[in-house]
Amino acid sequence: KNPLYFDPENIVRLAIEGGCNAVASTLGVLGACSRRYAHRIPFLLKFNHNEFLSYPNKFDQIFFASIRQAKDLGAVAVGATIYFGSPESSRQIVEVSEAFAAAHELGMATVLWCYLRNPAFKKDQDYHVAADLTGQANHLGVTIQADVIKQKLPENDGGYLAINTKENPYGKTDK
């Protein structure tokens, strides 16, 4: 719907012209124009993302770049998404934690897109945006040393209580 911004250089130029503090994108976009623009605007390389070709779609994030590649193209920060609560989240947590440690060793900042994905989180309301559940995801993000966390604003609370049943205990509550 916006073919002009399928061009990597146009994405970076828009960020510069718009007065953005940085531009976050993939290895392909940033790598295509890093020599020309990495000194003009900070680059944040998002090293994992979904592939959305598998059917049915699944909530998994796959590495498409390394931390070394991010550093080599002039990025000052790296970012990743973890889908907390998904069947693949344990693997994602370990992989991203290791990548963040490598980034910090190279002096780079880290950003975590911190989202919940689990069909059990939809009951009478959508608890993917519950303050208690997203708060736990944020806590895990800080634990793996994310410098910045991007999270959806809470729209409700009580996700643990709503999902927890006697037959299927879930999480930890004080009730």
What are these regions (language model features)?
Residues 2-175:
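Alpha/beta enzyme core
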